[in-house]
């Protein structure tokens, strides 16, 4: 019984030493034996879009709707075209860049909240 346990332990030690020789399927010494058929390493990072195209379009439509509402609040009328809405910059709380003051009303709630002007 102990021999089989010792035998399993020795097999685990052997497999543990073999695993230390490779990292993520690529040899430690950097030889090109593990390269795929396309010539790139199999453990190379590949770009995967975290946001699908439909999700990106939905986000853009939501942003455009927010800009349209901000345009209507600022000028008191509906925009003439989508081009005017896209060109009108709306206030972004997360944007830390310096923003032009002439696009915003000075009594706007964002400025009171964050202490601008």
Curated annotation (Swiss-Prot):
Keywords annotated in UniProt: Autocatalytic cleavage, Host cytoplasm, Hydrolase, Protease, Viral capsid assembly, Viral release from host cell
Entry PTM: The proteolytic cleavage of the internal scaffolding protein B releases the scaffold protein in order to continue virion assembly.
InterPro entries per the UniProt record, alphabetical: Phage_B, Phage_B_sf
Subcellular location: Host cytoplasm
GO cellular component term, pick one: host cell cytoplasm
Disulphide bond pairs: none
Enzyme Commission number, as recorded: 3.4.-.-
Site description Cleavage, residues in chain: 74-75, 90-91, 105-106
One Gene Ontology term of the molecular function aspect: peptidase activity
Pfam families: Phage_B
Biased composition (Polar residues): 1-52
One Gene Ontology term from the biological process aspect of the record: proteolysis
Region (Disordered): 1-60
Protein task: Participates in the assembly of the viral procapsid in the cytoplasm. Forms first a 12S pre-assembly complex with protein H, and F and G pentamers, then twelve 12S complexes are joined by the D protein to form the procapsid. Internal scaffold protein B is released from the procapsid upon genome packaging. Autoproteolytic activity cleaves protein B and probably facilitates its removal through the pores of the procapsid.
Assembly mode: Component of the procapsid complex composed of 60 copies of the internally located B, 240 copies of the external scaffolding protein D, 60 copies of each of the viral structural proteins F and G proteins, and 12 copies of H.
Family designation: Belongs to the microviridae B protein family.
Protein's name in the database: Internal scaffolding protein B
Species this protein is from: Escherichia phage alpha3
UniProt gene name: B
